[in-house]
Design a protein with these regions (language model features):
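Active-site helix of classical SDR
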Residues: 125, 161, 169
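Conserved glycine-rich cofactor-binding loop
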Residues: 7, 14-15
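C-terminal substrate-recognition "lid" of short-chain dehydrogenase/reductases
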Residues: 2, 125, 137, 177, ...
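Residue(s) in the substrate-gating loop at a strand-loop-helix junction
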Residues: 145
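The beta1-alpha1 cofactor-binding region of Rossmann-like NAD(H)/NADP(H)-dependent oxidoreductases
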Residues: 40-41, 61-73, 107, 220-221
């Protein structure tokens, strides 16, 4: 699919990885709806930066766990841009809780993580599906994690939410075929993100040494794969790990 003059919704578009994805899509000519739950000032700044690519961009507030807000978001984006070609589900929430500390994994924490990371993407996909079907084309890319490929990550709820998102990708690929393609990117530890902000260079290097490519992936690697999925015409239901080969080595 040619991305020039397309319209992309990027949830979590004001975050570190979300911003990089927005810029990668905008560099291909896509107009961007930068969706945020908090920090309107930051989202507005991102939208302003994106116009430097010669595209239109605007911030939109939305709590993806609330289906009514998601429906309003889709309506507002459609009214502003006239169409929706791409949905990137990048909004996420996590709290670091060791797997064996079940007392700290309260029902409230579990529910919040699952609601944002899994139910939120479901709301967004369900809301954009009628628009994309009517247009006869659409691309949806979910941002999961290698924690969804095996029992790893910073909490049980996070790993389960990302595993669910990977399976939701497959199910929605079936539900929305043949014109709407649904794929998933599963990043590992990415340099330059909040996940690595508190790690020392030695810790990052130690993690990278366990990867086949002997390096850590970064936000650009992830954003490039998102663009590849959006441009692809025959790939759907696929999850690609962006971790330099660490997750299966």
């Amino acid at each position: 699919m040619d991305l020039k003059n397309s319209v992309a919704i990027v949830t979590g578009g004001n975050g570190g990885l979300g911003q990089r994805i927005c810029h990668a899509l905008a560099s291909e000519g896509a107009n961007i709806a930068v969706v945020y739950a908090q920090s309107a000032k930051e989202a507005d700044a991102v939208a302003h930066e994106l116009t430097g690519h010669g595209v239109e961009a605007a911030p939109f507030a939305c709590d993806v766990t609330q289906s009514a807000q998601v429906a309003r978001l889709v309506d507002e984006v459609t009214k502003k841009f006239g169409r929706i070609d791409i949905l990137i589900n990048d909004a996420a929430y996590n709290k670091s809780i060791p797997f064996d500390d079940l007392d700290r994994m309260t029902v409230e924490e579990w529910s919040k993580i699952i609601d944002v990371n899994l139910t939120g993407p479901f709301h967004c996909i369900k809301a954009v599906a009628p628009v994309m079907k009517k247009q006869g084309r659409g691309r949806i890319v979910n941002i999961a994690s290698v924690a969804g490929l095996g029992p790893s990550g910073s909490s049980i709820a996070y790993a389960v939410s990302k595993a669910g998102l990977i399976h939701l990708t497959k199910c929605m690929a079936v539900a929305l075929a043949p014109h709407v393609l649904v794929n998933c990117v599963a990043p590992g530890l990415l340099e330059g993100t909040r996940a690595t902000a508190n790690l020392s260079n030695a810790q990052i290097e130690r993690s990278a040494s366990g990867a086949l490519l002997k390096r850590a992936a970064d936000k650009d690697d992830c954003a490039d794969q998102v663009v590849t999925f959006c441009r692809a015409d025959t790939t759907t239901g696929v999850t690609v790990a962006i971790d330099a080969g660490r997750s299966f080595h």
